[in-house]
């Protein structure tokens, strides 16, 4: 007998039971959360993170509509400051994770979570919290693209990467702010030092962009990172490492999704025949948030009014 043939009362009872079980599970998860981070900013509740991510998605949707009949913002100085600021932030995170894990004697093969208030463990948890915060700051990548009317840069890969990293890392900090979690964050923060250095240099304009021939290798570096993540996590599962299994499987699934998306980006960008200059499509994924030649020409020509309606 199918669900539609069931008595209304039994269907309601089943729905009520499922709802109550969900609520009980939610409450239980909070009993096993990391108590060290309970009072840290943004960690008391998931709603601030969800709200920020929702506002981000709304801006992705509404921002291009608002900018449609406006001149693009010229943001060279802002981009230079922002990108090199992100270099310093990621360098700080990498250093804290490296020094904290080294002093705590962490293993790169298998490391369980230590929820104690040991100075090195708290240092690692703090660095992971800053890593989570940095993913929220990275929402500005998209904001700058839209304000500069670079909407073709705001691809599915771009939005998926930014939105999921910030949201999912809240879960990571709330329950596993240490142990194996340090490895991926340490590797990713190091890669972001290189990436934002590239972005910062690109923001100086065309005179330096011709020397930045190594852009495609940033995408390759990202792909290597995802494969290393899968290999490292699979090894931990094989050795039955006492780290939450759900986190292991979530990391593998997440890395696989990025491999497919970045491979698609890499193939379209570097392996397919190049379009003509007039029809050239800007790249997504790790695309530069610097200043391109067309913006340089605008700056050297008639001054534009940032964000002003066209014709003013």
UniProtKB/Swiss-Prot annotation:
<feature type="compositionally biased region" description="Polar residues">
    <location>
        <begin position="273"/>
        <end position="292"/>
    </location>
</feature>
<dbReference type="GO" id="GO:0005783">
    <property type="term" value="C:endoplasmic reticulum"/>
</dbReference>
<dbReference type="GO" id="GO:0009922">
    <property type="term" value="F:fatty acid elongase activity"/>
</dbReference>
<comment type="similarity">
    <text>Belongs to the ELO family. ELOVL4 subfamily.</text>
</comment>
<feature type="transmembrane region" description="Helical">
    <location>
        <begin position="42"/>
        <end position="62"/>
    </location>
</feature>
<dbReference type="InterPro" id="IPR002076">
    <property type="entry name" value="ELO_fam"/>
</dbReference>
<keyword id="KW-0444">Lipid biosynthesis</keyword>
<feature type="transmembrane region" description="Helical">
    <location>
        <begin position="217"/>
        <end position="237"/>
    </location>
</feature>
<feature type="transmembrane region" description="Helical">
    <location>
        <begin position="78"/>
        <end position="98"/>
    </location>
</feature>
<dbReference type="GO" id="GO:0005789">
    <property type="term" value="C:endoplasmic reticulum membrane"/>
</dbReference>
<dbReference type="Pfam" id="PF01151">
    <property type="entry name" value="ELO"/>
</dbReference>
<dbReference type="GO" id="GO:0006636">
    <property type="term" value="P:unsaturated fatty acid biosynthetic process"/>
</dbReference>
<dbReference type="InterPro" id="IPR033678">
    <property type="entry name" value="ELOVL4"/>
</dbReference>
<feature type="glycosylation site" description="N-linked (GlcNAc...) asparagine">
    <location>
        <position position="292"/>
    </location>
</feature>
<feature type="transmembrane region" description="Helical">
    <location>
        <begin position="165"/>
        <end position="185"/>
    </location>
</feature>
<keyword id="KW-0276">Fatty acid metabolism</keyword>
<dbReference type="GO" id="GO:0019367">
    <property type="term" value="P:fatty acid elongation, saturated fatty acid"/>
</dbReference>
<comment type="function">
    <text>Catalyzes the first and rate-limiting reaction of the four reactions that constitute the long-chain fatty acids elongation cycle. This endoplasmic reticulum-bound enzymatic process allows the addition of 2 carbons to the chain of long- and very long-chain fatty acids (VLCFAs) per cycle. Condensing enzyme that catalyzes the synthesis of very long chain saturated (VLC-SFA) and polyunsaturated (PUFA) fatty acids that are involved in multiple biological processes as precursors of membrane lipids and lipid mediators. May play a critical role in early brain and skin development.</text>
</comment>
<feature type="glycosylation site" description="N-linked (GlcNAc...) asparagine">
    <location>
        <position position="20"/>
    </location>
</feature>
<keyword id="KW-0443">Lipid metabolism</keyword>
<dbReference type="GO" id="GO:0042761">
    <property type="term" value="P:very long-chain fatty acid biosynthetic process"/>
</dbReference>
<keyword id="KW-1133">Transmembrane helix</keyword>
<feature type="transmembrane region" description="Helical">
    <location>
        <begin position="246"/>
        <end position="266"/>
    </location>
</feature>
<keyword id="KW-0472">Membrane</keyword>
<feature type="transmembrane region" description="Helical">
    <location>
        <begin position="188"/>
        <end position="208"/>
    </location>
</feature>
<keyword id="KW-0275">Fatty acid biosynthesis</keyword>
<feature type="short sequence motif" description="Di-lysine motif">
    <location>
        <begin position="308"/>
        <end position="312"/>
    </location>
</feature>
<keyword id="KW-0812">Transmembrane</keyword>
<feature type="region of interest" description="Disordered">
    <location>
        <begin position="273"/>
        <end position="312"/>
    </location>
</feature>
<keyword id="KW-0808">Transferase</keyword>
<comment type="pathway">
    <text>Lipid metabolism; fatty acid biosynthesis.</text>
</comment>
<dbReference type="GO" id="GO:0034626">
    <property type="term" value="P:fatty acid elongation, polyunsaturated fatty acid"/>
</dbReference>
<dbReference type="InterPro" id="IPR030457">
    <property type="entry name" value="ELO_CS"/>
</dbReference>
<feature type="transmembrane region" description="Helical">
    <location>
        <begin position="127"/>
        <end position="147"/>
    </location>
</feature>
<dbReference type="GO" id="GO:0035338">
    <property type="term" value="P:long-chain fatty-acyl-CoA biosynthetic process"/>
</dbReference>
<keyword id="KW-0325">Glycoprotein</keyword>
<comment type="subunit">
    <text>Oligomer.</text>
</comment>
<protein>
    <recommendedName>
        <fullName>Very long chain fatty acid elongase 4</fullName>
        <ecNumber>2.3.1.199</ecNumber>
    </recommendedName>
</protein>
<keyword id="KW-0256">Endoplasmic reticulum</keyword>
């Amino acid at each position: 007998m199918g669900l539609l043939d069931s008595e209304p009362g039994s269907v309601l009872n089943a729905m009520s039971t499922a709802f109550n079980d969900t609520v009980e599970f939610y409450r239980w998860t909070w009993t096993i959360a990391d108590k060290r981070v309970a009072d840290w900013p943004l960690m008391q509740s998931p709603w601030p993170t969800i709200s920020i991510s929702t506002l981000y998605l709304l801006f992705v949707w509404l921002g291009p509509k608002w900018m449609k009949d406006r001149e693009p913002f010229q943001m060279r100085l802002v981009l230079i400051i922002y990108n090199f600021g992100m270099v310093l932030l990621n360098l700080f995170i990498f250093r804290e994770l490296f020094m904290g894990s080294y002093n705590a004697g962490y293993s790169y093969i298998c490391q369980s979570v230590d929820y104690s208030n040991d100075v090195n463990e708290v240092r690692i948890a703090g660095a992971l919290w800053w890593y989570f915060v940095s993913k929220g700051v990275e929402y500005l990548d998209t904001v700058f693209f839209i304000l500069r009317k670079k909407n073709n840069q705001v691809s599915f890969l771009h939005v998926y990467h930014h939105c999921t990293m910030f949201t999912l890392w809240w879960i990571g900090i709330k329950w596993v702010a240490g142990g194996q979690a340090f490895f991926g964050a340490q590797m990713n923060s190091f890669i972001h030092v290189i990436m934002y250095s590239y972005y910062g240099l690109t923001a100086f304009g065309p005179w330096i962009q011709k020397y930045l021939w190594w852009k495609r290798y940033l995408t390759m570096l990202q792909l290597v990172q995802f494969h290393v993540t899968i290999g490292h996590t699979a090894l931990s599962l094989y050795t039955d490492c006492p780290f939450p299994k759900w986190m292991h499987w979530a990391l593998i699934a997440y890395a696989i999704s990025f491999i497919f998306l970045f491979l698609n980006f890499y193939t379209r960008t570097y392996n397919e025949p190049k379009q003509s200059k007039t029809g050239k499509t800007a790249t997504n994924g790790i695309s530069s948030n610097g200043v391109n030649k067309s913006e340089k020409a605008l700056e050297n020509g008639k001054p534009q009014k940032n964000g002003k309606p066209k014709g003013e």
